[in-house]
């Protein structure tokens, strides 16, 4: 009598299963030999042409940069892709549009206050446009490139890297718009940057580049405005805002 809910097994299948059981239980049957030990793992090789860093090399570079060792910095947790990255920041500042525009458009002085900027030299200029040679260093790499800058006074400053060896793409845009109506010496600053490293090796430095250069940029220009124009306008805390987006 079949159990309730049981399923009928075809006769051919049942017969085959019974023969298998008789063979496995017969006195002369030999048990299958146990599996042998696994061979020792072969050392992994990394081709230098692939530009992949060993964990030890990542620790050395992180130590040189003064950063804590992290798998997400140059370890295997980071994706091996040369992905374009972007960062944007919007905030109210206690300086006028004209004052902030003057600070940002004065590329010649970047070496005096922009994080990790070692050199800044304007090589040509005409109304609304200029070209500048910049050198930016953040351990363990140094980048020299020409920046093509376009300006709309006092609303916008846009800079594009034209011949860099480190970056495949580097573009920064500053936009200035009116601030709080009741506080005329204020403005809204929108800063955005997008970049992509040329090589996979350098793309692993993206986290450090964000932390050491990009995220400090707006604050550095605000401090420069304080040096040139004095204390900022005092704005009530409830009227302040600061937005950051990163991809």
Curated annotation (Swiss-Prot):
Similarity-based family: Belongs to the COQ10 family.
Gene3D superfamilies: 3.30.530.20
PANTHER family assigned: COENZYME Q-BINDING PROTEIN COQ10 HOMOLOG A, MITOCHONDRIAL, SPERM PROTEIN HOMOLOG
Descriptive protein name: Coenzyme Q-binding protein COQ10 homolog A, mitochondrial
GO molecular function, one term: ubiquinone binding
Chain's role: Required for the function of coenzyme Q in the respiratory chain. May serve as a chaperone or may be involved in the transport of Q6 from its site of synthesis to the catalytic sites of the respiratory complexes.
The organism of origin for this protein: Homo sapiens
GO terms (BP aspect): cellular respiration
Example of a GO cellular component annotation carried by this entry: mitochondrial inner membrane
Alphabetically ordered keywords of this record: Membrane, Mitochondrion, Mitochondrion inner membrane, Transit peptide
InterPro entries listed in its UniProt record: COQ10-like, COQ10_START, START-like_dom_sf
Localization: Mitochondrion inner membrane
The protein's assembly and partners: Interacts with coenzyme Q.
């Amino acid at each position: 009598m079949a159990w309730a809910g049981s399923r009928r097994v075809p006769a051919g299948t049942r017969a085959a299963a019974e023969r298998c059981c008789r063979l496995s239980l017969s006195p002369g049957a030999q048990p299958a030999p146990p599996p042998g030990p696994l061979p020792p793992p072969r050392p992994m090789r990394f081709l230098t042409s692939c530009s992949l860093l060993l964990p030890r090399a990542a620790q050395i570079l992180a130590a040189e940069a003064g950063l804590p060792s992290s798998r997400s910095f140059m370890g295997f947790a980071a994706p091996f892709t040369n992905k374009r990255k972007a960062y944007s920041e919007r905030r109210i500042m206690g300086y006028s549009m004209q004052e902030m525009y003057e600070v940002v458009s004065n590329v010649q002085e970047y070496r005096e206050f922009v994080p990790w900027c070692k050199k800044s030299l304007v090589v040509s200029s005409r109304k609304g446009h200029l070209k500048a040679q910049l050198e930016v260093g953040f351990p363990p790499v140094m980048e020299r490139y020409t920046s093509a800058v376009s300006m709309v006074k006092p609303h916008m400053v846009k800079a594009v890297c034209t011949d860099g060896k480190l970056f495949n793409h580097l573009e920064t845009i500053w936009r200035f718009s009116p601030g709080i109506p009741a506080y005329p010496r204020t403005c809204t600053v929108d800063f955005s940057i997008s970049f992509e490293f040329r090589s996979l090796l350098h793309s692993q430095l993206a986290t450090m580049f964000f932390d050491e250069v990009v995220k400090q940029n707006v604050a550095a220009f605000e401090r420069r405005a304080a040096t040139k124009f004095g204390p900022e306008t005092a704005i009530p805390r409830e009227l302040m805002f600061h937005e950051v987006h990163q991809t």
